[in-house]
Swiss-Prot record:
Organism: Oenothera argillicola (Appalachian evening primrose)
Disulfide links within the chain: none
Function field: NDH shuttles electrons from NAD(P)H:plastoquinone, via FMN and iron-sulfur (Fe-S) centers, to quinones in the photosynthetic chain and possibly in a chloroplast respiratory chain. The immediate electron acceptor for the enzyme in this species is believed to be plastoquinone. Couples the redox reaction to proton translocation, and thus conserves the redox energy in a proton gradient.
Record-given protein name: NAD(P)H-quinone oxidoreductase subunit 6, chloroplastic
Source organism phylogeny: Eukaryota, Viridiplantae, Streptophyta, Embryophyta, Tracheophyta
Gene Ontology, cellular component aspect: chloroplast thylakoid membrane
Length: 176
């Protein structure tokens, strides 16, 4: 989207805060249905980030696949789960939780420090002139297909193998 600078910056901050609030909701809410709705908020904010960066195809795919299918599947799985058997084994705090929270807090502080120290306006976000001419001739979905079949072929195939193994594992767990 070609928006003026202040509006674009406001939308970035608004969507970023939506991501943070949704992520905290996924982790901190005790009701799993509310956590799934918070995950939906996170996925919608990510999709809107893609549309702000002029990747409309990826934004639509994000909405259709992750929000429309995966999040609904998670909601159905959570609703069919028996929550009473999981709440019996609840311990409030362990030593591993303290170590994990310490590590996560230190990573979070280092990320915030890096983000605040970076000069974002010094980064050149434009492309070269020959890339602009090449991108105008090919559509967005064609560019994704070309990159998936050339530059990102090996990672794409590795991700498909990982998804296949996780699907086989989920079927094996469901049969038991």
């Amino acid at each position: 989207m070609d928006l003026p600078g202040p509006i674009h910056d406001f939308l970035l901050v608004f969507l970023g805060s939506g991501l943070i609030v949704g992520g905290l909701g996924v982790v901190l809410l005790t009701n799993p249905i509310f956590s799934a709705f918070s995950l939906g908020l996170v996925l919608v904010c990510i999709s809107l980030f893609f549309s702000l960066s002029n990747s409309y195809f990826v934004a639509a795919a994000q909405l259709l696949i992750y929000v429309g299918a995966i999040n609904v599947l998670i909601l159905f799985a959570v609703m069919f789960m028996n929550g009473s058997e999981y709440s019996k084994d609840l311990t409030l705090w362990t030593v591993g939780d303290g170590i994990t929270s310490l590590v996560c807090t230190s990573i979070f502080i280092s990320l915030i420090t890096t983000i605040l120290d970076t000069s974002w306006y010094g980064i050149i976000w434009t492309t070269k002139s020959n890339q602009i001419i090449e991108q105008d001739l090919i559509g967005n979905s064609q560019q994704i297909g070309i990159h998936l079949s050339t530059d990102f072929f090996l990672p794409f195939e590795l991700i498909s193998i990982i998804l296949l193994v996780s699907l086989i594992g989920a079927i094996a767990v469901a049969r038991q």
